């Protein structure tokens, strides 16, 4: 059955500012030493005071359905293991850190013992230092080798922004160590003329799983000197590796371990995770290795005031008689505006790239009515920007030039934002783990912080803001991934065979599902068995068989038609719904109209315009069951698990009037369907059961959709 997913109006009437303009801004302290003077904590607004001012306008107080106060926590120090080089300890002390927290010292001890370890503590608890200190100490030891690279380390980040930020931190921390530590980023933004230097001379390489999958492992002979000296693999923000993406990354790591063994190395894995359920179990599933867990957070924490915020009603009887609330997008933009006027450094998290752009634009427009000098202190931050734009935003955020930022989850991860006073979360992000990760971005210097969850106008968000115990009294979720998924495993077996012929001894590394998948790959003539090994048979690159993030295809370049200027990129899957012909595209406060989308050449041509409407794509999704592997009774129905094919197609787009959200018209689109074969869970019911539940055919689709949301 196919369903149409119609996002609610994303832009509506904007209420006037409800706070008195504040002419001073509050400087923020960095996590470590800063060139800027550190402010007196007493001069910073308390979280309660900030929330009080946000709620001081007419009807504002009634929008707060609950306020949770998390008390401050004192820290517990320890000493570094005596095997850490004194030069490294001195470098850490130069950054203003005299003693480690107990969990940092414990993690370093495990790393030096050769135990793979996962540090699963709260945001801003110093996880980076826990793995950096043993890594730097080992690199310093290795610098005595004749080639100066007797030890190397590989850092994996889920985003380019986090890798670039970590590279800055490593350079700052290791500066007193001279050239013994040579960190370098190796990703899609790295100029080609720099790549050879990284391969030959860098001993701390920061990259992402995508580059490891497509760039490093297929070219492993060019990385031989690096790989044979590889002592540590650091996997930052490992809780983000879940679902299909996490399953792909798990297989990429198995390929890495296999290639390392070919060069005689067996690296220790150091993982950093947000607070999660059973982090050691998830880390073992990800790496395929036994992993020690360090989860007792001994760092100090400032007070956190967490408010649940429900936007006001705009209509008592909207579509189909249901009441309608003001959109979370508009409400979040108001709060970001108010916080900026107060001089409170803030980030507003939103799920979509378009939402981040909208919140930024709305906030800038409202700030222009109060103080035009504040307009340039608010911006959007999302994926798809050009590297130079992204780096400039990160510099401005790091320096304090930006007061307010509307960001996607690209900033949810551990990029050092030098401490924030407040975080506004536009709609429940889907998991409690992600909610706490976003909320934890505030107060990173140990000071008090404010977090506000703004509810979207949907049943789940409404339930959560009126049942705070569902958020505050329940543990975070486990990280779920399935490396044995045959649709994930198959392309990685091909990639592994292309890197090095695949032997029987390798199959244990890749898991028991190999026995079923390998014959299928042989039948498809992708692999051929010769003597005692399987070989890749095609001319094309095996690593190109799969996109580990599930997007597929080449990134689509967004180009200004009149000038030929490249504005940014979007992955092919998202291009269908965001840069189709006729779409309104937002980029750093400017509005563009998409004139054409060429999927063959991966180019969307746009021109600057100011249409009086926004656009929303409509799509259909159909799921076909290919094979049922497991089926068990589940109440009156059946619960099933097996292989499915998912087909999605963008079929049209709506034009909605700005401010009111009124639908002006619908335009059909002729875009190709996209299919994905994967594994799924589904339940089945009979017509008799539907009749007993009094569900008639007209509401069946909506009922199933509601059941889907309830189950996840």
Where would I find each of the regions flagged by the language model?
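Structured, non-catalytic alpha/beta "coupling" segments that mediate domain-domain communication
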Residues: 39-64, 352, 588-597, 601-603
């Amino acid at each position: 059955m196919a369903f149409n997913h119609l996002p609610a109006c994303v832009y509506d009437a904007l209420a006037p500012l409800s706070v008195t303009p504040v002419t001073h801004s509050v400087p923020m302290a960095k996590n470590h030493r800063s060139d800027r003077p550190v402010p007196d904590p007493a001069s910073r607004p308390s979280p309660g005071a900030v929330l009080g001012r946000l709620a001081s306008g007419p009807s504002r107080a009634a929008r707060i359905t609950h306020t949770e106060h998390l008390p401050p926590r004192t820290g517990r120090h320890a000493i570094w293991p005596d095997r850490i080089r004194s030069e490294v300890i001195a470098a850490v002390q130069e950054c203003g850190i005299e003693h480690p927290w107990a969990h940092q010292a414990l993690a370093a001890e495990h790393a030096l013992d050769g135990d793979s370890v996962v540090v699963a503590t709260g945001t801003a608890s110093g996880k980076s230092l826990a793995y950096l200190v043993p890594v730097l100490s080992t690199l310093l030891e290795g610098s005595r080798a004749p080639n100066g690279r007797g030890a190397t380390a590989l850092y994996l980040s889920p985003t380019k922004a986090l890798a670039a930020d970590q590279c800055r931190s490593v350079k700052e921390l290791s500066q007193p160590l001279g050239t013994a530590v040579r960190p370098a980023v190796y990703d899609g933004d790295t100029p080609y003329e720099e790549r050879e230097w990284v391969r030959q001379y860098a001993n701390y390489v920061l990259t992402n799983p995508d580059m490891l999958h497509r760039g490093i492992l297929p070219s492993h002979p060019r990385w031989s000197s690096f790989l044979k000296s590889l002592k540590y693999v650091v996997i930052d923000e490992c809780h983000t590796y879940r679902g299909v993406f996490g399953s792909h990354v798990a297989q990429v790591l198995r390929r890495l371990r296999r290639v390392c063994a070919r060069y005689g190395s067996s690296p220790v894995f150091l993982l950093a995770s947000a607070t999660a359920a059973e982090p050691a179990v998830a880390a073992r599933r990800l790496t395929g290795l036994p992993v020690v867990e360090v989860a007792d957070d001994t760092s100090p924490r400032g007070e956190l005031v967490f408010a649940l915020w429900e936007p006001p009603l705009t209509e008592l009887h909207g579509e189909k008689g249901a009441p309608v609330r003001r959109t979370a997008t508009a409400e979040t933009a108001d709060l970001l505006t108010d916080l900026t006027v107060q001089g409170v450094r803030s980030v507003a998290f939103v799920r979509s790239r378009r939402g981040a752009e909208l919140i930024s634009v709305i906030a800038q427009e409202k700030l222009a009515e109060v103080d035009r000098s504040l307009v340039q202190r608010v911006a959007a931050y999302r994926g798809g920007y050009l590297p130079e734009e992204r780096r400039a935003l990160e510099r401005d955020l790091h320096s304090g030039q930006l007061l307010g930022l509307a960001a996607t989850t690209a900033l949810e991860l551990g990029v050092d934002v030098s401490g924030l006073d407040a975080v506004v979360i536009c709609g429940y992000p889907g998991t409690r783990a992600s909610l706490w990760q976003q909320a934890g971005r505030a107060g990173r210097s140990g000071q008090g912080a404010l977090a506000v969850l703004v509810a979207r106008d949907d049943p789940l968000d409404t339930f959560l803001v009126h049942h705070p115990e569902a958020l505050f009294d329940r543990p975070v979720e486990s990280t779920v991934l399935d490396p044995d998924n045959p649709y994930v495993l198959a392309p990685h077996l091909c990639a592994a065979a292309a890197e090095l012929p695949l032997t029987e001894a390798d199959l244990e590394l890749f898991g028991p599902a190999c026995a079923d998948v390998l014959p299928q790959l042989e039948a498809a003539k992708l692999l051929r068995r010769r003597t005692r090994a399987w070989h890749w048979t095609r001319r094309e690159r095996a690593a190109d068989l799969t996109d580990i993030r599930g997007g597929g295809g080449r990134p689509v370049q967004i180009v200004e038609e009149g000038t030929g200027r490249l504005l940014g990129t979007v992955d092919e899957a998202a291009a269908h719904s965001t840069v189709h012909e006729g779409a309104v595209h937002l980029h750093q406060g400017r509005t563009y109209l998409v004139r054409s989308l060429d999927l063959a050449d991966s180019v969307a041509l746009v021109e600057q315009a100011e249409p009086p409407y926004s656009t929303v794509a409509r799509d259909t999704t159909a799921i076909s069951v290919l094979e049922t592997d497991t089926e068990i009774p589940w109440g009156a129905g059946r619960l099933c698990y097996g292989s499915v094919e998912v087909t999605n197609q963008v079929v049209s787009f709506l034009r909605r009037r700005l401010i009111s959200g009124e639908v002006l018209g619908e335009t059909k689109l002729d875009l190709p369907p996209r299919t994905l074969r994967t594994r799924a869970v589904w339940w089945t019911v009979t017509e008799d059961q539907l009749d007993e539940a009094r569900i008639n055919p007209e509401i069946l689709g909506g009922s199933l959709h509601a059941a889907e949301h309830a189950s996840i």
